[in-house]
A protein has these predicted regions:
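A short, glycine/acidic-enriched catalytic loop
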Residues: 102-133
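Active-site-proximal C-terminal subdomain of hydrolase catalytic domains
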Residues: 138-236
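Functional beta-strand-loop-alpha-helix junction segments that form "active/interaction loops"
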Residues: 52-94, 294
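Bacterial N-terminal signal peptides
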Residues: 10-21
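Caspase-like cysteine protease fold
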Residues: 30, 205-283
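Amphipathic alpha-helical coiled-coil segments
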Residues: 307-325
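Glycine- and acidic-residue-enriched helix-capping/strand-helix junction motifs
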Residues: 37-53
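Sec/Tat signal peptide C-region and signal peptidase I cleavage site
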Residues: 22-26
């Protein structure tokens, strides 16, 4: 399935050799894990959230880079094998996104994400992330007590009771979102439902760029959770947290993506996908700004902007030619 973003362009046909100058696009590998639901209503909620998240993922990455685990297939052994393969497939510029949708537990020392058979521990999750090439890998954990997972991965003690979340850790290898601020918030959470909802919501797209970033999805979900407890007239039993850098630049979904008709012009389809790939390269470059330094960052950004403008003109020229021939 090809998913592309609708564009408005200016006409001018440029040399096809221009595309040869565009570097290979870094890949986004997305893994959606649906854990044990237990009661039927929780199972239904997790089913719905996983489907919404997977649909959003398909607006950003190809089907072969989206892997879904649910039911009896969502085992610890299967996940360990999957991430071992990711470690072989991914390059230094690639990124990974891991969604953990389900229940969790914390006994005061160890966090576990509930799966059929042996559970995934926080140490398991950290080991999976540590083994991946590159940095800025994203994890969403919607379970109760998920804040305890953040504590182990970052090495920074989780806040207790009504304390504020600590500042980000020094590493930028991880971008972590948890439904709770620590391991003491043990009730089933609402955060995952609203986070999934944000991925297709124009209300969540604060900067109106047709992309939903980690930051935008987090802010939307946090506000909806707060409103839920306010409307219910009850004390909040969950307080989400976001840790790490680059949340505003890490896109999770693309709004208004369209599926090309079967009879669409193959050249236009290819050019639109290449235009979207350039958009993704700009987002990835933004994540590396501090690493590159301002001068090199601006040089690469200018180059990408010029290529984007030139490719945009090629697309419009091709659209004009295609329309004239109909």
């Amino acid at each position: 399935m090809r998913m592309v973003k609708p564009m408005l362009m200016k006409p001018l046909l440029l040399a096809p050799l221009l595309l040869a100058a565009v570097p290979a696009q870094a890949a986004l590998y997305i893994t959606v894990v649906q854990g044990l639901g237990g009661a039927a209503d929780y199972q239904q909620q997790f089913d719905e959230q996983s489907k919404v998240i997977s649909a959003a993922a398909k607006t950003l990455t190809s089907d072969d880079k989206l892997t879904e685990f649910s039911g009896d297939a969502a085992t610890r052994a299967a996940l360990l094998a999957h991430f071992a393969q990711l470690n072989q497939n991914m390059g230094e510029d690639d990124r990974a996104a891991l969604y953990l949708i389900g229940h969790g537990s914390f006994d005061g020392e160890e966090y576990k994400f509930n799966l059929p058979g042996p559970d995934m521990t926080a140490q398991d999750i950290k080991s999976l992330l540590d083994a991946l090439p590159g940095r800025n890998h994203f994890v969403l954990n919607t379970s109760s007590t998920s804040g305890a997972m953040v504590e182990l991965i970052t090495g920074v003690p989780a806040p207790r009771d009504d304390a504020e979340a600590p500042a980000d850790s020094s590493t930028d290898k991880y971008l972590l979102v948890a439904a709770t601020r620590n391991g003491n918030e043990r009730n089933a959470t609402h955060f995952g439902r609203y986070f999934a909802e944000a991925l297709s919501s124009e209300d969540a797209d604060i900067n109106k760029n047709n992309n939903i970033s980690v930051q935008e999805a987090y802010d939307y979900a946090a506000l909806q959770v707060e409103a839920y407890f306010t409307d219910a007239g009850s004390l909040a039993t969950e307080h989400s947290q976001l840790r790490g850098s680059g949340a505003a630049q890490f896109s999770l979904s693309r709004l208004n993506a369209i599926e090309l008709a079967p009879d669409a012009d193959p050249l236009i389809a290819q050019l639109l996908e290449e235009r979207q790939a350039l958009d993704t390269q700009v987002e990835e470059l933004q994540l590396r700004r501090s690493e590159l330094g301002n001068t090199e960052y601006l040089r690469q950004l200018q180059e990408l902007i010029l290529r984007t403008a030139e490719l945009t003109e090629r697309i419009e020229a091709a659209q004009g030619t295609s329309g004239a021939g109909q």
